[in-house]
Amino acid sequence: MLSNPSELVTRNIEQLENQRVMLINIEADELGHHLTRHCSEVAALALDFNHFQAQPSGKSGFRCEFGHQWSRDEKFDVVVVYFPKAKALAPYLFALAAWHLRPDGTLLITGENKGGIRSVDKLLGNAFSPACKIDNARHCLLYSATLVAEATKPNAEDWVSRYRLSLPSGDIQICNMVGVFSDKQLDQGTALLLDNLPKLEGRVLDFGCGAGVIAIALMQQNPGLQLECVDINAMALLSCELSLKANGMEAKVYASDGLAQTDGLFNAIVSNPPFHDGLSSTTDIATRFVADSYKQLHKGGNWQIVANRHLPYSDTIAKVFGEVNTVAENNKYKVYANKKR
């Protein structure tokens, strides 16, 4: 199966025939494998861990990595960029593309009409010729541009916004990579969670760590924690690492699909889970998170999250933990706190 933006690429396969091709911000489909039948080589960079896991392994002529950058300084004839949902991330992806293109190489940009791709020319930068629209189908657009200037390798730290936050435990510095949501102030949900954290010790998991606000607060309030921070977004993981470093703290930061890549039991799991839209698919993921959390807590371990009050957590929490314990709430959020019996 192919996503609509990928279908648009295959409609223009002559652009890629017998070329060395790199895909940046790849989606969870089979385009990479499909292109091996037409291209001399295909490499793919996934910024979403779920998209990385969806790629076929062991396919001849296809390599895929997860992260914020490709691990090798390779050059390609064509780079295909999937226009990101977070438009602020686009210039960074185009800078990556410029670095990995040979002189006069071709950049293809594919994405949904509603995703902001029409503003591509304003975001391309000076390394490329003006973008030319070459196809329009399946509610998506495909643009092409040519590398016209020598590019330097993007330094990730040049794409960070740094700002200070005041927490109940003290002031901290946050390092936020482009494309990672932040309004440069403590959001109401996280603030409510941090105001109601118990004293913690031992091995603790920050699920959906984002830029590391909760992680740093946990370390401030509980020195000596064995803290682990997980997310599916490569830019969020880098943000968390940089934020911890900026505050003189250390934690294990890694990608995980839900809790699947975590190992062993935790004394506590704390989260502002990234499940906010109330869609059935999102609710299913949230339900699984509650059940998986229970399995990975020590007996007596703490489980504490903040969630939009309209999301249907209560029934699942009651079923899994045996009761629902709401320790704080306002007109938008609830903080749930339970122990494993």
Curated annotation (Swiss-Prot):
- List keywords of the entry alphabetically: Cytoplasm, Methyltransferase, rRNA processing, S-adenosyl-L-methionine, Transferase
- Which domain of life does this protein belong to? Bacteria
> What Enzyme Commission number does this protein have?
2.1.1.172
Which molecular function GO terms apply here? Answer: 16S rRNA (guanine(1207)-N(2))-methyltransferase activity; nucleic acid binding
- Recorded GO CC terms: cytoplasm
Location relative to the cell: Cytoplasm
The EC category is: transferase
Reactions performed catalytically: guanosine(1207) in 16S rRNA + S-adenosyl-L-methionine = N(2)-methylguanosine(1207) in 16S rRNA + S-adenosyl-L-homocysteine + H(+)
Protein function:
Specifically methylates the guanine in position 1207 of 16S rRNA in the 30S particle.
Q: How does it assemble?
A: Monomer.
- The name this protein goes by in its record: Ribosomal RNA small subunit methyltransferase C
**Which gene is annotated as encoding this protein in its UniProt record?**
rsmC
